[in-house]
Design a protein with these regions (language model features):
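Structural/interface elements that position substrates and couple domains in central-metabolism enzymes
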Residues: 1-316
Length: 316
């Protein structure tokens, strides 16, 4: 605010902090939960001076009825937002690393994460095929840049961001190993949106997945119940569905409820050989019982007998 917004606001000759208040209050809601959280989640406020911060505190307390936390300065309020997003990003990166170990060691990370959280001191988020959205993959870069300007390097934050950025590549590499290469394969992505039930695709992992798959020589199609085919095309994707035929593997990117109830036997009949469940949406046994290979985040690859010898030897 102080560096970029203040000069614009003062360009007309008025002085911030004396002629008008300047307050920063970070957004602490998310799509589809805005109204549910507005009056419940504490509003953090900071101002260009104490009077501005107090005015912001009074405004939100009066009109939202929400608890308010006055942290003092504009920079302090900005820091609160960044620290929350960075916590989420680094926590997910840790979960992704634990999941990667589990995949190799023949473990199922999901019940183990649940068990870890029971001590009351561990609060692990859950792994996935990638991190998208307006905030989590973006905001760490703001603090990294700010630290660089101060002569600092925030190595853990950089590492967490790099781990999460690599996740699509690493998971597609697992799929490639399972299918003994992706050149000439048809891979179908389920979900463009970065979150279930939300028609938003900012920094969606689907883009990274498509890039990695194309670079591996695969044909890539996608579907999302929240987007028309023309909208997918406008965003650089090729629309399709499993029933069109010729699909070798399905990659779940978004856990839309429309994708929950799948006839895996029908998928097998259509020629699908492997499923990469990027959001732990499906029961692995259901996939395997249909004779498909199941690849899950944090779960060693498993296959039904119909494809174990035809595709690849997998961990059991």
């Amino acid at each position: 605010c102080r560096q970029h917004l203040l000069p614009i606001l003062e360009s007309g000759g008025l002085k911030g902090g004396s002629d008008f208040h300047i307050v920063f209050s970070p957004e602490r809601v998310k799509s589809q939960l805005v109204f549910a959280r507005l009056s419940k989640t504490p509003k953090v406020v900071g101002g260009i001076n104490a009077a501005s911060a107090a005015a912001g505190e009074q405004f939100y307390g009066r009109w939202l009825g929400a608890p308010t936390i006055n942290v003092g300065t504009l920079e302090a309020a900005e820091f609160v937002k960044l620290s929350g997003m960075i916590y989420r990003d680094v926590n997910i990166a840790l979960a992704n690393e634990l999941a990667r170990f589990a995949e190799t060691a023949g473990l199922n990370v999901w019940p183990l994460l649940d068990a870890s959280d029971t001590d009351g001191e561990t609060h692990l988020l859950r792994p996935g095929i990638g991190v998208g959205g307006h905030c989590t993959p973006v905001y760490p870069h703001f603090l990294i840049r700010g630290a660089t300007l101060l002569g600092l390097r925030l190595e853990l934050i950089e590492l967490g961001r790099n781990i999460n950025d690599r996740q699509p590549q690493q998971q597609i590499e697992r799929l490639a190993q399972t299918l003994r290469g992706l050149a000439g394969r048809h891979v179908h992505i389920l979900g463009l949106a970065f979150r279930p039930r939300v028609r938003e695709d900012a920094y969606t992992t689907a883009r990274s997945l498509q890039t990695v798959l194309i670079n591996s020589g695969a044909k890539v199609t996608i579907e999302d119940p929240l987007y028309e085919a023309s909208e997918l095309v406008a965003r650089g994707f090729v629309p399709g569905c499993v029933k069109d035929g010729g699909v070798d593997a399905v990659v779940l990117n978004t856990a839309h409820p429309e994708f929950e109830d799948v006839d895996f036997l029908d998928w097998r009949a259509q020629g699908v050989k492997a499923v990469l469940d990027g959001r732990a949406l499906w029961c692995a046994d259901d996939v395997i019982d249909a004779g498909l290979i199941y690849l899950g985040i944090g779960i060693a690859a498993r296959a039904g007998t119909a494809h174990e010898t035809a595709c690849v030897e997998v961990h059991t």
